[in-house]
């Protein structure tokens, strides 16, 4: 079963995205912040991690290292506002994150998993 971990998404986005995923038979786990998300990863296998940029407190490479230690090989997508500077997008992509503009749809997230 495909399962997605949503980290730090606002309530409306998490609910909308969660319901859209459930309609497609995709499980959803929700964490308020990265620390809670890492704790979830210790006990729950996921296929994809989706984190809101505003919840990432470390630099892109350090944050990528934490996710890689907690869930090796699991793809991490970072949602960012559409008006974010290109430099922020590039830094995240160079660290290995998939960068998607908010609001995100399940199809955007799941395309690389297919």
Q: Would you name each region that the model predicts?
A:
Residues 9, 79-83, 103:
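Conserved active-site segment of CheY-like receiver
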Residues 32-48, 56:
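Acidic, metal-coordinating helix/loop segments flanking the phosphotransfer/catalytic sites
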Residues 47-70, 80-88:
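Conserved phosphotransfer microenvironments
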């Amino acid at each position: 079963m495909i399962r997605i971990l949503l980290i730090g998404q606002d309530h409306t986005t998490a609910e909308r995205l969660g319901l859209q995923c459930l309609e497609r038979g995709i499980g959803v786990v929700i964490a308020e912040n990265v620390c809670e998300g890492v704790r979830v990863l210790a006990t729950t296998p996921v296929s994809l991690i989706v984190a809101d940029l505003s919840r990432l407190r470390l630099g892109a490479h350090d944050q990528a290292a934490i996710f890689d230690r907690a869930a090796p090989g699991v793809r991490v997508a970072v949602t960012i506002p559409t008006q974010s500077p290109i430099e922020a997008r590039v830094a995240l992509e160079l660290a290995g994150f998939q960068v998607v503009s908010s609001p995100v749809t399940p199809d955007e997230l799941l395309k690389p998993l297919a």
